[in-house]
Structures are given as structure tokens and as C-alpha cells.
């Protein structure tokens, strides 16, 4: 078992990974034992190569245990590498907080699409998550589908932290990219007349150009969603 007294969530994530890739348990322990930002950032970058990107595929007991630690949303889209990267970020937040901003900024700028997606999936797990709003907003403006999907789907961060105009823009971006609105955490509570009107315009534009409107546009019906 990976034990980290100051970082129980990180320890739990690493244990989940170690169960799935037991040959890498020693590496996970080695990195966790020396949680300086340089070591953690290197491990973050190497996660896919060392562990692969197979689905995390949690069972019911594992989901319940994570929920007890505050992770009560779906991790169905997470890979083993995503869980590991989330653990390294949480360790950096708990043990090297002064260096966390640089860590995140370097990975956001230099990491591949999978690393950037992992950053976004991990944002809700970080203390004082609101401070990373600019990182999420920058991803919203990007054009890499995998990165946008990590922000839109099964991620409570936007509904919790985005202001109305930014949240609405994200929903419209999701519609344009044909991402499933059913996987937007907290969408129902954030639907406004303004958003419903904008979504109706998207549908009208699609029909006018001979394209099918998004299948789950009904979720944005004002007073219904």
C-alpha cells in the first residue's frame, strides 16, 4: 500500500494505479517518497510511457472509497496515466505548493494533449481550485478535441467555478464539437434563458446549412433542463 499521511487522496489514487500495474509499484513509491516539484513534474510527463493509458475502470467499491474522499463524479473516462498524473499534482499541491503554478504552467505549455487533458481532469482535486480558473479558460478557447472533452465531460470544475458567460461559451463549444451534454456535471443548474437562446441559434444555423442539430440540445431548453 502507498501511504502518504499528508496526501490521503494522492495515496489512494496511487494505490489504485499500483493494483493495475503492479510492476510499477516500486516506481510509484520512489516518486512519492521524494515529492519535490522537479521529480513530480518529470514523473507527470513520463506517466503514459511508464504505465500506459488503459482505462482506470473502477469497480463499485473503489468508486465508493473515492467518493468518501470527495471525488463523487464519474472517472469513467480516466486512464491509468490520468490517475497517476492527478496524484502527482495533488502531491505537488500538498508538499511543494510554492512551485505548483510553475509546474502547471510548464505542462500546460509543453505537454502533449494527453498531459493537458490530465491537468484539466485534476483541477477539481486541487486545494483552492478557483485559482486555476485561467488554466481552464485557456483550454476552453483551444481547438484540441481531447483537451476540450476533458474540460467538458465528467468534470465538475466548470459548473463550480466558471462565471455565466464563460460557462455558456463552454456549452456552446461542446455543442459545436458534438460532445455529449449528458456528461456535463452540473449543467441543469446552470441553464439560463440566455444559454437556451444561444443554443437555439446553434440549432437553427445547423438546420440552415443542412446539418443535424445536436442530439441532446433538449437539455438546454429553458425551464426544462
Language model features by range: what are they?
Residues 80-198:
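Eukaryote-skewed repeat-based solenoidal scaffolds used as protein-protein interaction platforms
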Residues 1-94, 165-225:
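N-terminal alpha-helical scaffold/docking segments in eukaryotic complex subunits
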Amino acid at each position: 500500500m502507498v501511504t502518504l499521511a499528508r496526501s490521503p487522496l494522492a495515496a489512494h489514487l496511487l494505490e489504485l494505479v499500483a493494483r493495475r500495474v503492479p510492476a510499477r509499484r516500486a516506481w510509484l513509491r520512489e516518486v512519492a517518497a521524494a515529492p519535490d516539484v522537479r521529480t513530480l513534474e518529470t514523473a507527470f510527463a513520463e506517466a503514459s510511457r511508464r504505465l500506459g493509458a488503459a482505462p482506470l475502470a473502477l469497480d463499485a467499491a473503489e468508486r465508493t472509497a473515492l467518493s468518501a474522499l470527495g471525488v463523487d463524479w464519474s472517472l469513467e473516462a480516466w486512464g491509468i496515466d490520468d490517475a497517476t498524473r492527478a496524484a502527482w499534482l495533488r502531491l505537488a499541491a500538498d508538499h511543494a505548493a510554492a512551485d505548483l503554478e510553475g509546474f502547471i504552467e510548464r505542462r500546460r505549455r509543453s505537454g502533449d494533449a494527453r498531459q493537458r487533458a490530465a491537468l484539466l481532469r485534476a483541477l477539481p482535486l486541487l486545494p483552492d481550485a478557483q485559482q486555476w480558473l485561467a488554466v481552464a479558460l485557456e483550454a476552453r478557447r483551444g481547438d484540441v478535441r481531447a483537451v476540450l472533452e476533458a474540460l467538458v465531460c465528467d468534470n465538475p470544475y466548470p459548473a463550480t467555478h466558471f462565471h455565466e458567460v464563460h460557462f455558456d461559451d463552454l456549452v456552446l463549444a461542446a455543442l459545436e464539437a458534438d460532445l455529449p451534454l449528458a456528461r456535463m456535471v452540473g449543467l441543469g443548474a446552470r441553464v439560463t434563458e440566455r444559454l437556451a437562446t444561444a443554443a437555439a441559434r446553434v440549432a437553427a444555423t445547423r438546420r440552415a446549412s443542412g446539418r443535424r442539430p445536436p442530439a441532446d440540445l433538449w437539455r438546454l431548453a429553458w425551464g426544462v433542463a
